[in-house]
């Protein structure tokens, strides 16, 4: 069975965030927090989460999203949701 690595998920998440923020310079690490990324405000957060759900073919629960502290938490949530 083929598994997606954390780095592959991070790369896809980065692509989604770049697209949603219309900023090809965005660079994410597992430790990145939303407030450290220009333009990643509450409205952008909703758009990013919806785009990630569509990109990965998954659906998040609100309680899952509200518990995210950084991009690494998001990557692990995506991995667990697949």
For each of these PLM feature ranges, what is it?
Residues 44:
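Two-component histidine kinase catalytic core, primarily the HATPase_c
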Residues 48:
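Short active-site alpha-helical segment characteristic of glycosyltransferases
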Residues 2-26, 80-81:
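Thiotemplate assembly-line natural product biosynthesis machinery
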Residues 20-39, 55-69:
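Phosphopantetheine carrier-protein modules
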Residues 15, 73-76:
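Generic recognition of well-ordered alpha-helical segments
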Residues 56, 75-82:
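C-terminal alpha-helix/helix-terminus motif
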